């Protein structure tokens, strides 16, 4: 089970970083050096795992910021009008 949590965590962190890149004003709410903990609605097992990971890796005196998300939307392709041509 831990491996799937690790995979989900990597995906959520990547998506959160992309979100911050697209919405830089959001970074103003995150103190410098803070440990960011992503919490997903309706996934208490992952949330507990994520909090434990953050506490284990947190440097003393550093703040913790919880980022609550409702869900992760399906990834979409950004290809426009792809066409497949078979060469024989």
Question: Model-found features: residue ranges?
Answer:
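Terminal, compositionally biased segments used for targeting/anchoring and flexible tails
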Residues: 1-88
């Amino acid at each position: 089970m831990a491996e799937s949590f690790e995979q989900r965590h990597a995906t959520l962190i990547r998506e959160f970083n992309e979100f911050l890149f697209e919405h830089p004003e959001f970074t103003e709410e995150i103190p410098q050096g803070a440990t960011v903990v992503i919490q997903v609605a309706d996934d208490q097992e992952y949330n507990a795992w994520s909090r434990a990971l953050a506490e284990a890796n947190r440097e003393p005196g550093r703040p913790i910021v919880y980022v609550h998300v409702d869900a992760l939307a399906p990834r979409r392709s950004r290809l426009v009008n792809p066409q497949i041509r078979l060469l024989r």
